[in-house]
Amino acid sequence: MVSYYLHSPQFLALRPRSQKDYEYVLNRALQTPVSVSKAFESIRIAKVSVSDCKIVYQSWLQKGKRMANNTATVLSVVFNMAEELELLASNPMRRVKKAKQEVRRVMWSREQVKLFLDTAYSQYKWRSIGLIVHMAYEFAQRVGDMRLLEWKCIDFDTKRLDLVQSKRRAEVHIPINASLLAMLKEQHDDFGFQEYVAPQVNPRDKNYRPYNEFDVSILVNEVKAEAGLPKELTAMDMRRTAITEMVEAGVATTQIMAVSGHNSPQSMRPYIKHTFKSSQNALARRDSYKNEVS
């Protein structure tokens, strides 16, 4: 059934990036053990039960709520298609209670960012992972866009990034600071012969491919462990951290939106954390205004 879905018009209508992610998620889901001697893929589609789905979902939860829910969502697409084809009476994944994902407020400190990057850049195997996280932080962009970033988006002459975001198709044009520019030039010297800015450092079948989201998570965790950083930190928190830093610096909302690609101030709310520094800056500006008018 999964093979049928992967050749269906519904799947082929997805963007290439989504196709790669869906295929990877489905392949991993099929390998999930249902029992000691049986993998999920060994069960005939008509025989998949709610109990089977609950077992594999609990296994996915060990890798995190986000990953578990994402996998369940993608697999449900296949089950829904099977239901439409009358191969299943109903989608068994619908009856699996999903873990609630709390709104994340986690942020990196500047010291933690530096420690992560120093650790990642210290070993060749983590070089591209370090660059992906570095760009996500400096550009305030999503990790997904950075792992798939192509050299055509980087203009070394004008020192800028020109990107069409994958989620909302927003266009952003961002200057590249000196430290990141130096890393990009070094990366281009070694990997400029192919299209991706931060590909897997070891080619497969002589092809350099981008990391998928799960590999990024695994390798980021490796770097964090080596650096002694808290487990709660994730690469996706870099975007929130960067946006919050701009808020604390007193950058105008419209200017932040020009960097982040948000289409309204309301859509920025999940990324903004109320901090002491923000309050301090706000009250300092109010006091300054009061002194001016008194």
Regions found by a protein language model. Name each.
Residues 69-71, 84, 88-143, 147, ...:
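Basic, Lys/Arg- and aromatic-enriched nucleic-acid-binding interface segment
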Residues 107, 165-169, 260-285:
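Catalytic-site neighborhood detector that most strongly recognizes the C-terminal catalytic loop/helix
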Residues 112, 139-141, 148-189:
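Conserved tyrosine-mediated DNA breakage-rejoining catalytic core shared by Y-recombinases
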Residues 200-206, 286-294:
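C-terminal secondary-structure termini that scaffold catalytic or DNA-interacting sites
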